[in-house]
Amino acid sequence: MKLLVIGSGGREHALAWKLAHSRRVSEIIVAPGNAGTATETKCRNAPVKVTDLDGLLALAQREAVNITVVGPEVPLVAGIVDCFRAAGMRIFGPTAAAAQLEGSKAYAKDFLARHGIPTARYAVHTNVDAAISDVRQQGAPIVIKADGLAAGKGVIVAMTVTEAEAAIRDMLSGNAFGHAGARVVIEEYLDGEEASFISMVDGTHALPMATSQDHKRVSDGDIGPNTGGMGAYSPAPIITDEIHARVMREIVNPTVTGMIADGTPFMGFLYAGLMIDVHGAPKVIEFNVRFGDPETQPMMMRLQSDLLDLIEAALNGDLDKVQAQWDPRPSLGVVMAARPYPKAPITGEIISGLDALPANVKVFHAGTALDAAGCVVTAGGRVLCVTALGSNVSEAQRHAYAGVASLHWANAFQRSDIGWRAIMREHTVTLNVHGPV
């Protein structure tokens, strides 16, 4: 079977890598791909941009692709699933209408409110003065979100009213996010711990994937601006069995039935970004309509089932008949980025050490390319995700950072504390069992 994976990030490298494990897969085309997918077993790249829907469809038809899997949100919101389906091509992902769950934060908040799904209080504004008046009335901390797609960087957690006002002006007047910032969502600040809850959905049924937790802020200690994600681990210990059942009952299943009721049934990967409060009550912070990045990388390290089997079950409406099997060991991924990300990064620098990695480490490429001499060079802000399994999160972290230590380029940087919340929990459990040391 021949597959097409659309995208060029670490998520797409991880999806292609896992799909290549299927005995039924003969070849995977990754469009446009990166230096990692260019050399991955069974994979080859095709130089077609994710925004070129006609070009991607022509590629799939020319190559007689059996199934297409879409990685990033941009082509989904643009309607690539509608485009492929109209041409009779099998593709896994939501329609443009269903993808508005991520494409518009205002749409998502209205959907949540309409269907009684727990989320933060909110208001939507297009006028600067009205938005600022709202913020002054509510006070800080408060959350300001650009309505549209902003590559994971359109959320400002303002700790002061002054900071909130500046964010509003940047989005509505300063054009900081272009059309994506033409509307803003002002949200109640929620206390608690975040987690990523991703499910496969076939339109009617939802199959939960492994839980995970990412690290949005650029610097250690969860400080600095938001990024697309600086690392992740799976599973997320905050999601206990009880909370897992509650998320399915109160959030995931009502979302699936709500989309059906609204006439926009959802098929694809449904990502619920959650805040879990001290009482274990989950609320939706955001929806994404695709696998998370970098959550995909540690999740694919743990997935023991054939991913193609799961995707085919979803396409056939049979997710209620399958289960996903997971390695019980945790996995952790550390993103290596290029300075000064999340600002425009320095690119074109040769990466060394890729041929000398520890055996228990897998490196998923994101912002990489091959230069004229065949060397792997930096080509984006988030460059690599160094991923490893371990008997616990502490061990997975040690393995991943051992891999990081063997990789080098001039302007590389990474956080040094990926997994800190889970590791703190492990240490607490050890102290409770053995007493103070």
Swiss-Prot record:
Highest taxon, organism lineage: Bacteria
Free-text cofactor note: Binds 1 Mg(2+) or Mn(2+) ion per subunit.
Keywords from the named record: ATP-binding, Ligase, Magnesium, Manganese, Metal-binding, Nucleotide-binding, Purine biosynthesis
Associated pathway: Purine metabolism; IMP biosynthesis via de novo pathway; N(1)-(5-phospho-D-ribosyl)glycinamide from 5-phospho-alpha-D-ribose 1-diphosphate: step 2/2
Named cofactor requirement(s): Mg(2+); Mn(2+)
Signal sequence, start to end: none
Record flagged with keyword ATP-binding: yes
EC number: 6.3.4.13
Transmembrane region(s): none
Record-linked Gene3D superfamilies: 3.40.50.20, ATP-grasp fold, A domain, ATP-grasp fold, B domain, Phosphoribosylglycinamide synthetase, C-terminal domain
Pfam families: GARS_A (PF01071), GARS_C (PF02843), GARS_N (PF02844)
Catalytic activity: 5-phospho-beta-D-ribosylamine + glycine + ATP = N(1)-(5-phospho-beta-D-ribosyl)glycinamide + ADP + phosphate + H(+)
Domain ATP-grasp positions: 109-316
Binding site for ATP: 135-196
Binding site for Mg(2+): 286, 288
MF terms (GO), sorted A to Z: ATP binding; metal ion binding; phosphoribosylamine-glycine ligase activity
GO BP term, pick one: 'de novo' IMP biosynthetic process
NCBIfam families: purD (TIGR00877)
PANTHER family associated with the record: PHOSPHORIBOSYLAMINE--GLYCINE LIGASE, PHOSPHORIBOSYLAMINE--GLYCINE LIGASE, CHLOROPLASTIC
Family to which this protein belongs: Belongs to the GARS family.
Name of this protein: Phosphoribosylamine--glycine ligase
